[in-house]
Design a protein with these regions (language model features):
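Classical Sec-dependent N-terminal signal peptides that target proteins to the secretory pathway
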Residues: 5-25
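Flexible, surface-exposed loop/linker segments and immediately adjacent secondary-structure boundaries
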Residues: 99-138
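Gly/Pro-enriched, hydrophobic low-complexity segments
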Residues: 91, 123-209
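Extended beta-sheet lipid-handling architectures
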Residues: 44-48, 60-62, 75, 87, ...
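A generic structural motif
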Residues: 47-51, 76-78, 95-97, 144-146, ...
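N-terminal leader/targeting segments and the immediate start of mature chains
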Residues: 22-58, 71, 199-212
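Beta-strand elements of well-folded, non-transmembrane domains
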Residues: 50-52, 67-71, 147, 161
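An acidic-aromatic
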Residues: 64-113, 174-177
Length: 212
């Protein structure tokens, strides 16, 4: 879920083969910025594939994602393990049902969060170069960090028919992760109460207030 923030490393994703590495024109950048500006909320089912450095799938996961500006989201994995990541905009709470454990952390600790990046126009303009390719009327956007020694790894977004179809990024373990979305819905009414946590009494709770 989170992008790696230390020394710049990455696996060359197979999707990069399709890119012409042409910097986006003003209109093309506006295409993406207009796209994210129009989205106040979205929800989707997803299937997630995690690959090792040889490109072999080592884990398949599935679940649901609900997002609301700014930085409120519920990322719920249902298979193979039941884990929830809940952000109320200030804190990220991880609920692991198998471990019966809850971890509460400051949102600022995860500034490299994939959702924080691709929905934040100011952050993108300041820290990333965008390149694009259009294949079968689908927009493939590659985000390359300007400061490769400090900031985030490359990540890719595929947009089709005004919907996010796929995201590919690196996780904290140098593994390539691809999230494939389905039933993608935008601008539905989502109440803030959805992002409040309900912790079972028998769960262990760990609070980490560190910002870094």
């Amino acid at each position: 879920m989170f992008l790696k923030q230390n020394k710049f490393k990455l696996i060359i994703f197979y999707l990069l083969l399709f890119f012409d590495n042409t910097a986006l024109s003003y209109d093309e950048k506006n295409f993406y910025y207009n796209f994210i500006d129009k989205i106040n909320t979205f929800s989707s089912k997803f299937i997630q594939h995690t690959y090792d450095e040889n490109g072999t799938i080592i884990k398949k996961s599935s679940g649901n994602l609900i997002y609301k500006k700014k930085l409120k989201y519920l990322l719920e994995y249902s298979k193979p393990n039941k884990v929830k990541f809940i952000s109320d905009g200030k804190f990220i709470t991880t609920i692991d049902e198998d471990l019966e454990q809850v971890i509460i952390q400051n949102q600022k600790k995860f500034y490299g969060n994939i959702f924080n990046i691709f929905t934040n126009k100011t952050l993108i303009e300041k820290n990333f170069n965008l390149t694009k390719s259009i294949i079968n009327n689908e927009h493939y956007l590659k985000f390359t960090p300007i400061d490769k020694d400090i900031y985030y790894n490359i990540f890719l977004i595929v947009i089709s028919n005004d919907k996010i179809k796929k995201i590919t990024f690196m996780n904290d373990f140098d593994q390539s992760v691809t999230m494939i979305f389905s039933d993608f819905m935008t601008n539905e009414i989502i109440l803030d109460s959805l992002f409040k946590i309900d912790i079972p009494d028998e769960f262990d709770v760990i609070v980490d207030n560190k910002k870094e």
